[in-house]
């Protein structure tokens, strides 16, 4: 088999939803080639295979029971704990108080459209990849500000997550942070630069921000305690995409479709709510993630509405108003 045919074969098998657990060794070798894995020793490779096999079994079970589809992907040789530790970054707060105004979403929702998506209005920037840096909090907050800027100025921009990692001393850089405290930090810093002026490094570094290059400034911030999940529809249409906290453990191997089974064993990841809709009579929310476009639905994922999917109904959703 020539090299081109080999990789076409690998791509087709690894991306198939009809997995067979008995073929786990074959899938694993294909996975190793596709993602250029080098484990350093046979002992470590065997350890990774056992984790891979466990994840494959879970993928098969989910594909049999959920309306969404799951696949072998770049995280499939990592345990859930490893993935959460390396690729998320939401820090659970000791206390949630800061100077962002608290709003309780405890009123029934108003009447609105059955479907709405800020992407269709070209107000959502491209999906980014946080890599092995626990800065989801920075990506989600800045993604919302990028959308705020697009709504206000009809221009898509990319803001600097690295500035947040290096210069936000309220949060902890690649070691984690929170959404409302990130907005607080931006207010204290005075603004945020463009990513092109302060490129992403996926690591903690010294603060090098230049206030003369601030493009976006925050004047107010809000934190929401979600009682009625449906009320998020009104809020989304009113204020723009919303950074939210979730438990990402059940979305790691997600490929496509509407997730019905996503539980909350502890909030650990920040994502951006960008829309909602209905498919096959199932109402869903659409989120933008920060794991690259090679994950999920081109970097986005959908969950069923009104089941507190992934623990999304909590008190950590936050937004900000820009000048």
From Swiss-Prot:
The alphabetized list of GO BP terms reads: proteolysis
Its top-level enzyme class, in one word, is hydrolase
The record's section on InterPro entries has: Papain-like_cys_pep_sf (IPR038765), Pept_asp_AS (IPR025661), Pept_cys_AS (IPR000169), Pept_his_AS (IPR025660), Peptidase_C1A (IPR013128), Peptidase_C1A_C (IPR000668), Peptidase_C1A_papain-like (IPR039417), Prot_inhib_I29 (IPR013201)
Give residue ranges for the propeptide.
17-112
Q: Which SUPFAM superfamilies match?
A: Cysteine proteinases
The pH profile of the activity is: Optimum pH is 5.0-5.5.
EC assignment: the record states: 3.4.22.50
User: What family, per the record?
Assistant: Belongs to the peptidase C1 family.
Role this protein plays: Cysteine protease that plays an essential role in host liquefaction to facilitate horizontal transmission of the virus. Accumulates within infected cells as an inactive proenzyme (proV-CATH), which is activated by proteolytic cleavage upon cell death.
> What is the protein name stated in its UniProt record?
Viral cathepsin
